[in-house]
Amino acid sequence: MLIYDSQYTPDEYAGVTGRSKVGWGHSTYVAGCELARSAGVGQYVLFHHDPTRTDANVMDLERRAQDLFAPSIAAREGLVIHLDETARAAWAA
């Protein structure tokens, strides 16, 4: 599982739709999808959403991420993730 700062879209990050966010310490959902795929993780969790986003905006980003890396979900208030024994053993190693 990868829980990754996915605050911006690529256009927001690059400054296409406003001020560039490069160097602000955040990332994009696309970079998260690429990292999840290259690392071979089983689940990607988009985390640290831009505070100006509505729930509908976050759901849209979740769908976009799923188009790039199917096992993607957006973190949301109240989300609980249960790890199986294999994941717990890997975490402890």
Q: Each predicted region: which residue ranges?
A:
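Cap/insert and terminal regions of metallo-dependent hydrolase folds
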Residues: 1-77
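A short acidic, often aromatic-flanked loop/helix-cap motif at beta-alpha or helix-coil junctions
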Residues: 78-83
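Short, surface-exposed amphipathic charged segments that create phosphate/polyanion-binding patches used
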Residues: 84-93
